[in-house]
Regions:
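Cytosolic juxtamembrane helix at the C-terminal end of the final transmembrane segment
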Residues: 6, 34-37, 85-99, 135-153
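Short, highly charged, low-complexity non-transmembrane loops/tails of multi-pass membrane proteins
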Residues: 43-50, 151-153
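Cytosolic juxtamembrane helix and N-cap/initiation of the first transmembrane helix
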Residues: 1-38
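Membrane-helix interface and helix-disruption motif detector
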Residues: 64-71, 95, 117-128
Length: 153
């Protein structure tokens, strides 16, 4: 009985394509958030900026808004980037184990929850990103089933 398998080529390309789609959706959403003045004004009215924000100009507040958008962007794309890079090394040099699948499923669920908790649900890019995360979870579960099928042979 083998505890690890080589990553199937189709599964690797599926995982990388889903990660690319998630990154693209997140990029488009952050681009729209950073450049829309209505969203900036909504951010000003809903955010709890504190006392020092009263003395800042609109230009300084917009700079703060852009920094928040960029920080959020990097936090959201780190997980799909890491999944794609680790899958590449697993596909070319390493083997897939149950531990690989379990750890990435937990991390992807956490990234999905982080995205789900902090977004507007009416955004088409949020919906696309959520579908991408669910597809990535199902791809990892399929990879786990491939390991079980090879082990039972």
């Amino acid at each position: 009985m083998r505890e690890s398998i080589e990553m199937p080529k189709g599964t690797f390309y599926t995982i990388v394509a889903i990660c690319a789609a998630i990154i693209m959706m997140t990029s488009m959403e952050m681009l729209i958030k950073a450049k829309d003045t209505d969203l900036f004004n909504m951010w000003l009215s809903t955010s709890n900026l504190g006392e020092d924000a009263l003395s800042q100009t609109t230009k300084e507040l917009f700079s703060t808004h852009l920094n928040v958008c960029i920080s959020t962007f990097f936090i959201r794309i780190i997980t799909p980037m890491a999944v794609a890079i680790h899958s590449y090394f697993t596909f070319t040099k390493l083997r897939v184990t149950k531990l690989f699948v379990a750890i990435w499923v937990v991390i992807i669920i956490g990234a999905f929850a982080l995205t789900f908790l902090g977004e507007q649900f009416y955004s088409i890019f949020f919906i696309g990103s959520a579908i991408g995360y669910l597809a990535l979870i199902f791809a990892m579960i399929y990879l786990g089933k491939c390991i079980r099928n090879v082990r039972s042979i």
